Design a protein with these regions (language model features):
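Nuclease catalytic cores that cleave nucleic-acid phosphodiester bonds
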Residues: 2-125
Length: 125
């Protein structure tokens, strides 16, 4: 088992490290280059700045049985699809039974607030 932390603005890094250290579990903190993290225990991986660069790097690293700490429902869904465990920084577990509801709820909140994602149109010439 390995613990991967979506470390951009994650307030529980110290707690994760303390628990992981007591169980001798490796931890990797992933953040973009706009943040600076140091750790005596965890490996820190910097990913180039980009909309979802950290998220995709984290998902490329995690494997079945690993633990992902994230507040991003999309990252949690992708981790679950790989057979990893996913937990919110507040302690709520993401599961295959609740992730669909959480994603749909988020979608409705965005729509209710008139938030729409921009769609790129590529010209073919």
């Amino acid at each position: 088992m390995h613990i991967y932390v979506d470390a951009d603005a994650c307030p529980v890094i110290g707690i994760v490290e303390r628990i992981a250290k007591s169980h001798n579990i490796a931890v990797t903190l992933l953040c973009d280059t706009n943040h600076y993290l140091t750790s005596d225990y965890s490996e820190v991986v910097y990913v180039g700045a980009g909309a979802d660069a950290v998220d995709f790097k984290l998902i490329s690293l995690c494997e079945k049985g690993d633990l992902v700490v994230t507040q991003d429902y999309g990252v949690a869904a992708m981790a679950l699809s790989k057979g990893a465990y996913a937990i919110h920084q507040s302690g709520k577990w993401y599961t295959n039974e609740n992730i669909d509801f959480m994603l749909i709820l988020l979608y409705h909140i965005f729509r209710q607030n008139n938030f729409y994602f921009e769609v790129s149109v590529y010209e073919t010439s």
